[in-house]
Amino acid sequence: MRETIASNNKALVLAAFDTLFNTRDYAAAERFWSPHDVQHSAHIEPGRDGLLNLIKGLPPTLKYEPGTIVAEGDFVIVHGRFSGFGLPVNWIAADMLRIENGRLVVHWDVIQDEATRASSKSGLPMFGDTFRA
């Protein structure tokens, strides 16, 4: 049973992120987020509308690539890459979300610029197995 809940919650987050960030279907995206979504992100205004308005203001070239995703109970954490949003560097993000009644209700994130091969002290990429060109 716990595996089913975790799998369903991971699938919900992946579908929500793809619908909002990649497909940019705002009407469909609304069904994934509570209208009263609590945002702990420094980049997003309160509520679902704050998130939708932020994305509407970004270039249509915005893309999100999910990486590792972990779920425990009502929480999902996904490590991903945002690109094409108008800055010269990509962002690597760890997003943590709480799910209630099949909707995303709370969001936290940690975001940083993606390191290049030249700037990586470890010599390892921050996302995936290879550095982006």
Language model segments and positions:
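C-terminal and inter-domain tail/linker signature
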Residues: 1-133
